[in-house]
């Protein structure tokens, strides 16, 4: 049987980090087994579902490289199908109409709570065989078995068993003809021929109810795998403040999609002590039943380390487009400065994110705005003008503006003046960048460009003379 998995987000919000991990695990399991990965948009919550959220989910999936093998399925386009299946269950005596008012249902709930029982529907309409009538309280309920147990072997959690007496007759169709979650997902997974249902363990209590629906429909039962939660760094439930943000905010913060993928896969799965995987290695090695049953903790320092690894090792040509995007987000005209690939080579060892790289790269695309006064006091003081004047003369006279020629010129100054290279580099570094920290000084000057470098040296000389 061909493996078919699905990711089924609800577009009531954006794709968060937990959902992205679920999508990744579904995608990897399908790819490893040469199966199909499908996407379903569970958009039946008409009050909260938005097109903006749908678009954001699709965009995030594309950014992460989690391609799906068939067009997305939208639940709102399948309302007629849910009604057909509900009608079949009614005809077979496996479901029934109920017309209980909200007050009646609330009274049932309160009575159960007073006696210490779990709130549940008491089955008042189960045997009444009530006919259809136009009523705002009309629902269709599934006749859950009263006896026996529901048992299944979860690929992550192991054997799970619950008595049917613990389950009530759940609503499957609302008064407006829209399905409930538990009903829709069973019909969808059946129609989509899903063989492995991989989802968060917040759905595990729904599974016995869904299994009974599968049996009632005579539908083949998929295998279930319920993923543990992702907690924040303090071990608490994720919030937007502690990491449960829109996946695209990770892009906006400067993380690479393959770095995020590499990090996410390790939140619950491992292959020995190996930390870094390319995508093909993940496809070859990942197995859903190897996922840990315990909750994983977010570790932003580890994500930063993984991201920096790829910044250091990826081809600069592949890093250039996302760097350009980050530069443009800062309002920078990339054509006004050095080639992005050169910037990457200059900064890749010094930053963890592309956002940080873009911030540091501003010195090569924008006029120098200010000086670090501590750096000025230390390096732009009387006496420093000698090295700067020599630098200006030699840099202006270079036959070609190359990093090697710049480096040779600066070393010539140190030799001529019989001073250490630091006495040349540090005043020049402050003149060019406004700070006393930068990449290699020759490379820093080269990326600034001849005309801009000379202009900044002139400004530094004026600053020294007026100090």
Swiss-Prot record:
<keyword id="KW-0030">Aminoacyl-tRNA synthetase</keyword>
<dbReference type="InterPro" id="IPR049940">
    <property type="entry name" value="GluQ/Sye"/>
</dbReference>
<dbReference type="GO" id="GO:0008270">
    <property type="term" value="F:zinc ion binding"/>
</dbReference>
<protein>
    <recommendedName>
        <fullName>Glutamate--tRNA ligase</fullName>
        <ecNumber>6.1.1.17</ecNumber>
    </recommendedName>
</protein>
<comment type="similarity">
    <text>Belongs to the class-I aminoacyl-tRNA synthetase family. Glutamate--tRNA ligase type 1 subfamily.</text>
</comment>
<dbReference type="InterPro" id="IPR020751">
    <property type="entry name" value="aa-tRNA-synth_I_codon-bd_sub2"/>
</dbReference>
<dbReference type="GO" id="GO:0000049">
    <property type="term" value="F:tRNA binding"/>
</dbReference>
<keyword id="KW-0963">Cytoplasm</keyword>
<dbReference type="InterPro" id="IPR001412">
    <property type="entry name" value="aa-tRNA-synth_I_CS"/>
</dbReference>
<dbReference type="InterPro" id="IPR020058">
    <property type="entry name" value="Glu/Gln-tRNA-synth_Ib_cat-dom"/>
</dbReference>
<dbReference type="InterPro" id="IPR008925">
    <property type="entry name" value="aa_tRNA-synth_I_cd-bd_sf"/>
</dbReference>
<comment type="function">
    <text>Catalyzes the attachment of glutamate to tRNA(Glu) in a two-step reaction: glutamate is first activated by ATP to form Glu-AMP and then transferred to the acceptor end of tRNA(Glu).</text>
</comment>
<keyword id="KW-0648">Protein biosynthesis</keyword>
<dbReference type="InterPro" id="IPR000924">
    <property type="entry name" value="Glu/Gln-tRNA-synth"/>
</dbReference>
<dbReference type="Pfam" id="PF19269">
    <property type="entry name" value="Anticodon_2"/>
</dbReference>
<dbReference type="InterPro" id="IPR004527">
    <property type="entry name" value="Glu-tRNA-ligase_bac/mito"/>
</dbReference>
<comment type="subunit">
    <text>Monomer.</text>
</comment>
<keyword id="KW-0067">ATP-binding</keyword>
<dbReference type="Pfam" id="PF00749">
    <property type="entry name" value="tRNA-synt_1c"/>
</dbReference>
<dbReference type="GO" id="GO:0006424">
    <property type="term" value="P:glutamyl-tRNA aminoacylation"/>
</dbReference>
<feature type="binding site">
    <location>
        <position position="240"/>
    </location>
    <ligand>
        <name>ATP</name>
    </ligand>
</feature>
<dbReference type="GO" id="GO:0005829">
    <property type="term" value="C:cytosol"/>
</dbReference>
<keyword id="KW-0436">Ligase</keyword>
<dbReference type="InterPro" id="IPR014729">
    <property type="entry name" value="Rossmann-like_a/b/a_fold"/>
</dbReference>
<keyword id="KW-0547">Nucleotide-binding</keyword>
<dbReference type="GO" id="GO:0004818">
    <property type="term" value="F:glutamate-tRNA ligase activity"/>
</dbReference>
<dbReference type="GO" id="GO:0005524">
    <property type="term" value="F:ATP binding"/>
</dbReference>
<dbReference type="InterPro" id="IPR045462">
    <property type="entry name" value="aa-tRNA-synth_I_cd-bd"/>
</dbReference>
<feature type="short sequence motif" description="'KMSKS' region">
    <location>
        <begin position="237"/>
        <end position="241"/>
    </location>
</feature>
<feature type="short sequence motif" description="'HIGH' region">
    <location>
        <begin position="9"/>
        <end position="19"/>
    </location>
</feature>
<dbReference type="InterPro" id="IPR033910">
    <property type="entry name" value="GluRS_core"/>
</dbReference>
């Amino acid at each position: 049987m061909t493996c078919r998995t699905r990711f089924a987000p609800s577009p009531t919000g954006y794709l968060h980090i937990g959902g992205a991990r679920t999508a990744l695990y579904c995608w990897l399991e399908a790819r490893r087994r040469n199966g199909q990965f499908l996407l379903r948009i569970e958009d039946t919550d008409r009050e909260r579902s938005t097109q903006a959220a749908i678009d954001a989910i699709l965009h995030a999936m594309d950014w992460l490289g989690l391609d799906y093998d068939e067009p997305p399925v939208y639940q709102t386009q399948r309302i007629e199908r849910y009604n057909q299946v509900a009608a079949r269950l009614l005809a077979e005596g496996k479901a029934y109409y109920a017309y209980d008012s909200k007050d009646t249902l609330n009274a049932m709930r309160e009575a159960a709570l007073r006696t210490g029982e779990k709130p549940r529907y008491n089955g008042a309409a189960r045997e009444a065989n009530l006919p259809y009538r136009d009523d705002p309280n009309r629902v269709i309920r599934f006749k859950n078995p009263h006896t026996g147990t529901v048992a299944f072997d979860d690929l992550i959690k192991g054997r799970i068993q619950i008595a049917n007496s613990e389950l009530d007759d759940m609503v499957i169709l609302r008064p407006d003809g829209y399905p409930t979650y538990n009903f829709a997902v069973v019909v969808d997974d059946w129609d989509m021929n899903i063989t492995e249902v991989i989802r968060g363990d917040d759905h595990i209590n729904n599974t016995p109810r869904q299994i009974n629906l599968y049996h009632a429909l005579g539908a083949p039962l998929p295998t279930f795998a319920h993923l543990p939660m992702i907690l924040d760094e303090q071990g608490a439930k994720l919030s937007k403040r502690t990491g449960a943000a829109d996946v695209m905010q990770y892009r906006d913060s400067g993380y690479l999609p393959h770095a995020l993928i590499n990090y996410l896969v390790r939140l619950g799965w491992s292959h020995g002590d190996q930390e870094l995987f390319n995508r093909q290695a993940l496809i070859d090695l990942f197995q859903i039943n190897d996922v840990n049953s315990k909750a994983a903790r977010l570790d932003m320092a580890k994500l930063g380390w993984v991201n920096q690894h790829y910044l250091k090792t990826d081809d600069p040509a592949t890093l250039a487009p996302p760097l350009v995007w980050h530069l443009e987000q800062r309002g920078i005209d990339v054509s006004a400065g050095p080639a992005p690939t050169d910037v990457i080579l200059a900064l890749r060892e010094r930053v963890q994110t592309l956002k940080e790289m873009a911030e540091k790269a501003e010195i090569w695309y924008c006029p120098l705005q200010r000086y670090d006064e501590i750096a000025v006091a230390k390096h732009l003081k009387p006496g420093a003008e000698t090295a700067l004047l020599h630098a200006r003369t030699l840099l202006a006279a270079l036959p070609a503006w190359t990093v090697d020629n710049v480096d040779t010129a600066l070393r010539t100054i140190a030799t001529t003046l019989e001073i250490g290279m630091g006495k040349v580099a540090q005043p020049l570094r402050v003149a060019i960048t406004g700070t006393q920290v930068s990449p290699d000084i020759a490379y820093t000057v080269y990326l600034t460009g001849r005309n801009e470098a000379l202009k900044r040296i002139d400004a530094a000389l004026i600053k020294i003379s007026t100090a």
